[in-house]
A protein has these predicted regions:
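A short, N-terminal "cap"/entry segment at the start of jelly-roll beta-barrel domains
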Residues: 1-50, 54-57, 123-125
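A generic fold-level signal
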Residues: 24, 38-40, 61, 85, ...
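Short strand-coil-strand connectors
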Residues: 37, 77-81, 104
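Conserved hydrophobic/aromatic positions in well-ordered beta-strands
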Residues: 44-46, 67, 108
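Short, conserved beta-strand element in jelly-roll/cupin
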Residues: 59-76
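Short hydrophobic/aromatic-rich beta-strand segments that constitute the beta-sheet cores
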Residues: 76-78, 109-110
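Short acidic-glycine-tyrosine-enriched beta hairpin
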Residues: 79-96
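Ligand-binding loop in jelly-roll beta-barrel domains
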Residues: 95-120
Length: 125
């Protein structure tokens, strides 16, 4: 990799792709996505305050997520299992796994392939 390619990669990592804010009566989700310009992987930092989604569950039809808890704590409630997490924990969410978040925390999420909203589905179960 050339020096210019390394510099380009570093510049891409510093560029915010988008900021998503979801507010409801019971939850707040703040997401910072980084423009990696790579369809195979992406990175974001989510701040979750409350339950997300507010009702039901969500699932990613295409993406697998590795989540690292930066601070605070909470639970991820999978269809068959409730997992408590704390700062420093790592959580794997497989594609097509059904879940919802509940807590007050900041989480780094790495998705492969890169996350896109059309493949994320909200479910009322």
């Amino acid at each position: 990799m050339s020096k210019s390619q390394i510099d380009d990669s570093r510049a891409n990592c510093r560029n915010l792709k988008n900021i998503i804010i979801v507010n409801s009566d019971t939850s707040k989700l703040l997401e910072y996505s980084i423009a990696l310009n790579d369809k195979e992987i992406d990175f974001c930092i989510n701040t979750i305050n409350g339950r997300y989604p507010e009702k039901g569950y969500c699932t990613n039809e295409k993406c697998k997520e590795i989540c690292y808890v930066l601070d605070e704590n909470g639970t991820i409630n999978k269809k068959e299992e409730k997992i408590e997490f704390n700062q420093g924990d790592v959580i794997l969410i497989d594609k097509e796994e059904v879940y919802y978040w509940d807590g007050n925390c900041k989480i780094i999420m790495i998705c492969t392939p890169a996350w896109y909203k059309e493949q994320c589905k909200l479910l009322e179960i």
